[in-house]
């Protein structure tokens, strides 16, 4: 068995580099322009929750999803961005400077204590192409259990990530199939788990904390 099937996959980017983080932010939508459709869908779903809600984003990157949600949902109580990369958070602060409800937490959602650092319960947790940054899909079950605990009741999770690009050990270790994602979510006690949108290998899943 290939070691990549058992071990965490090394990072391919230096996320401590502001230049590299900025280059990613500029190129992301050029490489996958259909990402905008998913951001729009997430923003629309958050808008249905009503005013005064608290939203947490895991793996916020350069703030593209946060910007779309905050544009659409001006009545949120708070929007908390979590990322382990200070350069990514710096880019987010610049992009979101006009949104006073945005706050920023430098931590890895792979750590055991990130749930303590984000501060309280949230009505909605969102994530856009970040779960694979766990660097191995075996960590996803624990992550979703942690997410479940930081959700209020009722609470909504909207998580988008790529399916495997091919059958290589690297891709199979990093990315989950639709079935694997839904199994991990239901295993963490989320209900009404289903695919909300799928396009060009990107899949948006939702799940609820109802009790």
Where are these regions (language model features)?
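Conserved class I S-adenosyl-L-methionine
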Residues: 1-49
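Class I SAM-dependent methyltransferase SAM/SAH-binding core
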Residues: 56, 62-112
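Alpha/beta-hydrolase-fold catalytic nucleophile elbow
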Residues: 82, 128, 160
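A short acidic, Gly/Pro-enriched loop at the edge of an enzyme's catalytic core
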Residues: 115-125
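A short SAM/SAH-binding and catalytic strip from SAM-dependent methyltransferases
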Residues: 124-138
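A short glycine-rich, Lys/Arg-flanked "PGG" loop and its adjoining helix->strand segment in the class I
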Residues: 141-153
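C-terminal alpha-helical "lid/dimerization" subdomain adjacent to the S-adenosyl-L-methionine
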Residues: 156-205
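C-terminal lobe and adjacent flexible extensions of AdoMet/dcAdoMet transferase-like proteins
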Residues: 205-211
């Amino acid at each position: 068995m290939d070691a990549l099937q058992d071990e965490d996959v090394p990072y391919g980017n230096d996320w401590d580099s502001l230049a590299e983080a900025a280059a990613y932010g500029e190129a992301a939508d050029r490489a996958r322009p259909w990402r905008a459709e998913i951001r729009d869908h997430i923003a629309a779903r958050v808008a249905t929750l009503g005013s005064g809600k608290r939203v947490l984003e895991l793996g916020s990157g350069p703030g593209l999803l946060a910007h779309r949600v905050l544009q659409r949902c001006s009545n949120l109580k708070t929007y908390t961005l979590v990322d382990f990369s200070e350069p990514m958070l710096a880019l987010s602060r610049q992009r979101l400077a006009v949104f006073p409800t945005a706050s920023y937490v430098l931590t890895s959602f792979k750590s055991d204590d990130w749930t303590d650092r984000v501060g309280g319960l949230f009505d909605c947790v969102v994530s856009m192409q970040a779960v694979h940054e766990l660097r191995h899909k075996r960590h996803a079950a624990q992550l979703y259990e942690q997410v479940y605990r930081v959700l209020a009741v009722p609470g909504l999770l909207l998580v988008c990530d790529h399916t495997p690009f091919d059958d290589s050990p690297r891709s199979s270790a990093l990315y989950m199939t639709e079935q694997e994602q839904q199994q991990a979510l239901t295993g963490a006690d989320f209900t009404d788990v289903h695919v909300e949108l799928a396009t060009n290998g990107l899949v948006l899943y939702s799940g609820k904390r109802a009790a």
